[in-house]
Amino acid sequence: MMSKLLVQSFAISIDGYGAGPNQDLQNPLGVGGPELMEWFFHTHVWRQMHGQDDGETGVDNSMAEQGFAGIGAWILGRNMFGPVRGPWPDDSWKGWWGDEPPYHTPVFVLTHHPRAPLTMAGGTEFRFVTEGIDAALDQARAAAGGRDVRLGGGVATVRQYLQAGLIDELHLAIRPVLLGSGEHLLSGIDMRALGYECARHVAGERATHVFLRRRA
């Protein structure tokens, strides 16, 4: 069976924004964007990523854990890899996460500008794909070895894959906050027409987790 393309633990505001306005090096999630991730910052999964052994182990943590299970490769939009725009000036930028990113698999980064692969500690290898979303998915599936592929974002990248009908399941972590502006995830996309339905929803401590699945 072909591996699935999954969006997991993707945080949005109650008014549908997946990032705030004015994203830059100081505000990678945009103004107000960190509020979207408050549900994740308290989990044991997040704390463990940062070398600590505390954090909450409730529903939100369980949802976050499930998002990493069975994943053999990731796909990221370029903005999820870093703030650099245009041609790469050099290879000095190595991602937001330090020497050992939390992926531990091959990660395919969508970009218009070629760059050599980048091997990091812990099994992460960033591979830069210039041929578009279909090529990135084909390469990720080949690298995943039968496991699923996780699409990490950002908003524009998820929208591209949604509009192409390529995402099998979308897990949204809906935060009870209003952003008012920024990058809207589903604006102008008819999810029903694309064949998606709400498969389940779970109330967590700081977010409501909604799973949208494409009908077979």
Regions found by a protein language model. Give the residues of each.
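Enzymes that bind and transform nitrogen-containing heteroaromatic metabolites
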Residues: 1-216
